[in-house]
Amino acid sequence: MIHLILGGARSGKSGYAERQLADLCPANVRPWYLATAEAADEEMARRIAHHQTARQGGSLEWQLAEVPLDLAKALVQRSGSGAPVLVDCLTLWLSNQLCFGADMASERAALLQAVAEFDGDLLLVSNEVGSGIVPLGELSRRFVDEAGWLNQALAAKADRVTLVVAGLPLALKPVSSDSSGSLGLSASGTSPDPRGKV
């Protein structure tokens, strides 16, 4: 089962993901926490420490792997292990890739393939960054574009997609008993109504 969990900064998405994973985790199994953050400055070090402290108070004994760049390989290595995997977060992984000048098309393709082929329960945390203003800088605009494309591609592959706002989870997928999940759109993403109304 692939579950994509989206939300803004400090929306509660990480805590929600950890609780969801705790519900999935079989007894006597140590789930994997794949952390993509690097403590490049004091503020990021505090954020990392906050997440670590929050996890220590929970009921799970985590296996931690720090994976700032080679996330696809880390997923392949853990596929079929029987231990659920939580990736937190894809936004920082993307930021790391862009800062290191990676070929995003190939990195995104490798990650999407690893996710599609993953055997087990996989929870992916990512920021929803496309709801704000268009950034002024070229790198910032590219980041927002890449994050949007990545989130869309992952949402298409995911069994479940949840948006967390103010600590409240909103189920985006599945949305109803309609197996297409199309919200009235055709397979091409266009409205079936010739006037463009859904």
What are these regions (language model features)?
Residues 49, 53-54, 58-79, 84-99, ...:
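Portal/gating segments that form or line small-molecule/metal binding sites
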Residues 183-185:
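Leucine-biased recognition of intrinsically disordered, low-complexity hydrophobic segments
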Residues 2-77:
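Conserved P-loop
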Residues 17, 51, 86, 127, ...:
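Residue-level signal for inorganic ion chemistry
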